[in-house]
Amino acid sequence: FIQLAEQPEMRFVISNTTEAGIVFDPSCQPDDAPASSYPGKLTQLLYHRFKTFNGDKNKGLIIFPCELIFLNGHKLKETIYQYIDLWQLGEAFKTWFEEACGVYATLVDRIVPGFPRKEIDTIKDKLQYNDNLVVQAEIFHLWVIEAPQEISREFPADKAGLNVLFVPSEAPYHERKVTLLNGPHTVLSPVAFLSGINIVREACQDEVIGKYIRKVMFEELMETLNLPKAELEPVSYTHLRAHETLRHL
């Protein structure tokens, strides 16, 4: 993988190594092939690129970690600095990393149950070919990137019709997601479980429990957020529609 660093046109690194992926493992060494941790691998890649292009600041990389960690970019950057110091990669490389590269915090918001095992035969009949890479996901999607607006000109995902926002701070969107998506799940779980319902869709479609979860979302959880209701209500309705159509625990 290290040869990727030698490609002059390379510009972006996007990762999702799960919540456990951004960790500092002091046992990683600079000559590991490759390092076992993701931040270790990334530091190796960046250092090889730095040496390949003799510290050219036009060859820096823009890095978007998508791991579900609040301020994931800050955590990843902090971990890279730890490897720079541990491996004694030098002040010149550290300066290049600081000035030529950008590590930006992101927030991804989309329910992705994964491979639709129960519906795959119907899907294959519709497609008229076998596709074992089918992934089921809700229609709603949001990718918040805490980065300057000029980065959006290099990464114009919104021009492709994707709901990608470049914002000064991801914090309000993180709070919104935790409150309106994760919050209802937390409230719903014990009530549905004790009622003999294990699937979110079935709980939302239940006459009593469905009414209960709507009341919690719109009359209680939403009131705790310091954001305009005009912005919050469409998001809440979208999450509800997803819960009512996707089969997930």
What are these regions (language model features)?
Residues 1-241, 247:
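Substrate/ligand-engaging "lid" and interaction regions
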